Amino acid sequence: MKTYAIYDEEWKMKCPIGYLYYYDKCNEFIIELNRELDKWEAPLLFSSYVEKSIYTIPKEVSMLWVKGRVIPSGRQNIGSILKNHKMKSYDEMKLLELSGGRCSQDNCYIKKVEFEDVPLAIRKRSEDNVLECFTSGESDVICLFGDDTVRRIDLTKLVEANGKIASVLMNKDVYKSVKVGVGGYSIAFNDCIEIEKWLLLKTGKKINVSAKDLYSFVGDNIVDTAKACEILGCSKQNLTYLIDKGRLKPIKPNLKENLFFRGDVEKNSW
């Protein structure tokens, strides 16, 4: 993950208005805003979130912010522009870096920083991100969070907040496809229908995990070496490298074949 501070030359506090997290392996973005922003000071795209005291911007909206600040892929002379900058293909992040994140819409710009440079209060927001998730019954999802809590989310109660949930409940394969969204900021169905962490925490009921739920978890979220290689699109040799580097940990050592938590494997695809 790469981290960028977002500045606004017009903001009175003269410190970053937020931070852009770029997950380069999957080309996804998450923006964390400064809580001192009000809806009038926040970029227009984010004002409705700030008004609701939501300062973690979803990946789709974060991507829209990025796309609004770079040359569009459909521009007539995009080929020559990429060639001039020695780019083999269209890359939003590289174009954003080239422009410094500046555009005619406002006075915002970005500056590369280390994650450790992000204020602790903002970094701590990710401490309760989703670690694992799995389905239970016909319409529930069990989520394990970084703050060591487990919550049961009844999807039928979220249809009003997110109409796309209805299509999830009507298709068992889509329902079973649930996985942790990039960075743990959401859960995702079929890689396209997401429920943000704040909504999961708000509506989910804290539970003591039952044996039935654990059996479901084991069946859905523990994968062998072959499946791990399939998820990451890599060879067994590459998988061994990740294990040696401590980026992937087998559930139990000294087995004839390694087993992994699916969420731990998927983190290496972000």
Q: Where do the language-model regions lie?
A:
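Short, solvent-exposed cationic patches
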Residues: 33-47, 51, 164-185
